A protein has these predicted regions:
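Core beta-strand elements of the Rossmann-like FAD/NAD(P) dinucleotide-binding domain
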Residues: 49-58
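Central beta-strand plus flanking loop segment that forms part of the substrate or channel wall
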Residues: 80-110
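Generic structural signal for small/hydrophobic residues in well-ordered secondary structure
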Residues: 22, 60, 99-100, 141, ...
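Active-site-adjacent segment of FAD-dependent monooxygenases/related oxidoreductases
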Residues: 1, 99, 181-184
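Non-transmembrane alpha-helical segments in soluble domains
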Residues: 19-23, 38, 162-169
Length: 192
């Protein structure tokens, strides 16, 4: 990893690099992609949403606690454990993130870090998300608008985010090569 801001580190290649590294340690026939788990029997039988089953010696759930609560587990957890799984908030579960990519991180040539905090959004926290070598350049920001107010406003949010990048980093920020709005509040694997 490398530091992009004091006290925080990023994984070169992003989280997918971590996922790919972990997946490379698993024999391909044993790796199941796009296979949501529907049921786990504590004897080791795992049933997938499509009805397929496997038997596992060990089962590790590395998913948000609220998502664990959506899987049928036999024998069931006691009521207190079930309730605690539902009550544990998913970190970032209600958040949204906007990313804009550019041919290069032009803001660095202006002496700007790409990091910003703002109260006049829609983004409240912005960072340089460029690859370590600077190609492509990328800026991302966390949306500070509550999920209920974001609902159905994706196009307006994209426009407002680009405008905010323009105010902060200049006119070149108004013409990204690619943009993406990721709203975890509506992702069933993140927030339930």
């Amino acid at each position: 990893g490398y530091a992009s801001m004091e006290g925080s580190y990023r994984i070169e290649g992003g989280m997918m690099a971590l996922v790919a590294a972990l997946a490379s340690q698993i024999a391909p026939p044993r790796l199941r992609l796009d296979a949501p788990v529907a049921e786990i029997d504590q004897s080791g039988i795992v049933t997938f949403a499509n009805g397929d089953t496997i038997t596992a010696e060990r089962i590790v759930l590395a998913i948000p606690p609220r998502v664990i609560a959506t899987i049928k587990i036999t024998p069931d957890f006691d009521a207190a454990v079930q309730q605690s799984l539902i009550n544990i908030p998913t970190w970032m579960g209600g958040q949204a993130k906007f990313v804009a990519t550019y041919a290069r991180p032009f803001w660095r040539q202006q002496g700007l870090s790409g990091d910003a905090m703002g109260r006049h959004g829609p983004m409240v926290e912005i960072h340089d998300a460029s690859a370590k070598d600077g190609t492509p350049g990328a800026l991302f920001g966390f949306i500070g608008v509550p999920a209920a107010q974001r609902d159905g406003q994706s196009d307006a949010l994209r426009t407002a985010c680009i405008a905010q990048f323009g105010r902060l980093f200049g006119p070149e920020a108004l013409t990204p090569q690619k943009i993406e709005l990721r709203d975890w509040a509506y992702a069933p694997q993140t927030a339930t």
